[in-house]
Amino acid sequence: NPLYSTDETISNGFSHNAAENKTYYQLKLDYQREFDRHNVSAMVLFNRSSRAYDNRVEYRYQGISGRATYAYDNKYLTEFNIGYNGSENFAPGNRYGVFPAGSIGWVISREAFMKGTEKWLDNLKLRASFGLVGSDKISDNNDDRFAYLQFFQGGDGYSFGFNEFGSGYDGLKEGNFANPNLTWEKARKTNVGFDATLFNGKLTIAADYFREHRYDIITTLSDGDKMGYPDIVGKDAPFVNSGIVDNQGIDFELGWNSTIGKDFRYYIKPNFTFARNKIKFMNEVDYGNEYRQKTGRRLGEHFVYVVDHFVYDQAEADKLNAMNDGRGFQPWGELHPGDVVYKDLNQDGKIDDYGDRTHMGFPRTPEIQFGIPFGIQYKGFDVSVMFQGSLNSSILLNGAAVWDFPSYEQDQYGKVKHMHLNRWTEATKDVATYPRLTYGAYENNKNGNSSLFLYNANYIRLKNLEVGYSLPKNIIRFAGLQNVRFYVQGFKLTNIRQF
């Protein structure tokens, strides 16, 4: 073999083929009838699905659902749904869940006592819905499937001999603990709202109030500060149904579509959503410090050290480094002038993970989201614009986004960030908002998991802009064309934010 300068046969090759097969069965029965002012309908649906990917065990689901509706005079509306769904993720006996839901509606604008409003009120509908929904998602990790089964997995750390290629024969070890009682995560949802159309369709209004009570949340007690197993057990705690989270908020949309004269048309349709959640129960460790607890707080709040000040001079640095019998006030190395000093929240004379971190800022997911689409049209010209933004959100920056002179990000070598411009120096020590710049030694006191790098993530951006022109009909009709439009479109053209 001249390519490899050897006459030996090259073996031990590797090949891999993968295929995905999906199978879906559905049986559906529908019924619908109208008589006098009554309208009734019903539906029964059975479905079963399976998905096989590569050499994994098939994913399988099946269920039966039903729906019944009744309307009287297109004025009083009702609907009832029920689902009986089964998932492979749970043990027999816990595999199926029953999930009912219902809704009612009242088209109040059709009532006799609303007579006289039709001159300005086109439609007014009040509505409400309620229901129970379920989730069988355990995690995004395929290895977490069948969490109700105890299994064995390949061992590590010791080999029982070696094969001819030098690979060891590993043993087996018991996998993570199973939970045969694991079942569906559930959420009770309620929604009330109204829809209105006024002035011959020019003005539209839609408003909703929603509330969700989520319970039996599928989680593992090994996450964070939850009540898991001690290390001596040697295994992670199993997945369990534990946790309660409430969420509530409002949706609002307002639209106006009208004309000025014969040729000028315009529209605007702003929308707004506010949602806030609260952890009602979480099986977490009680450290005796309320500021550490997640129960009673919002999901996604940042758990950080709190910056107190920067070391003012060498005398202060020496004093802090001498604390705790020379081990120092903070565990990340010697402090120097300009370094960050964190707040001792539990007042034990030192900074540590268990007592000196707390929840700060807004959650990662915005609580407020809004959009402002609008546009105009004049003869053949048209312009459409979409602004979009969010409020009540915080982000914890890390890595190359904030650290001094990062050498591990290919496009960030030595780049100075805007927050570095207000760094600590002897001349700026009284007004600095960022610690001294360092590289190499003594840089660890800028802990990335701290309020120093917690930023307001509010933003508004010009998400979409489109400008177009349509050729006059009397020009293109000779070519047998119905419409010819030229346009220029841009996405994410500008962004206003703090960082």
Task: Show which residues each predicted segment covers.
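Conserved SET/PR-domain catalytic core that frames the SAM/AdoMet-binding pocket
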Residues: 269, 356, 366-380, 463-468
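Residues embedded in well-ordered regular secondary structure
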Residues: 10-21, 25, 31, 55, ...
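Extracytoplasmic gating/loop element in the C-terminal half of outer-membrane beta-barrel translocons
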Residues: 390-485, 489-490
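Conserved small-residue
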Residues: 142, 150, 257-364, 404, ...
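Conserved active-site-proximal loop/helix segments of enzymes involved in bacterial cell-wall
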Residues: 219-223, 351-353, 401-403
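Extracellular/periplasmic, surface-exposed regions of secreted and cell-surface proteins
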Residues: 1-304, 445, 449-499
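Glycine-rich, aromatic-lined ligand/substrate-binding cores of catalytic
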Residues: 363-398
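A short beta-strand motif that forms part of the nucleic acid-binding face
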Residues: 84, 211, 388-391, 401
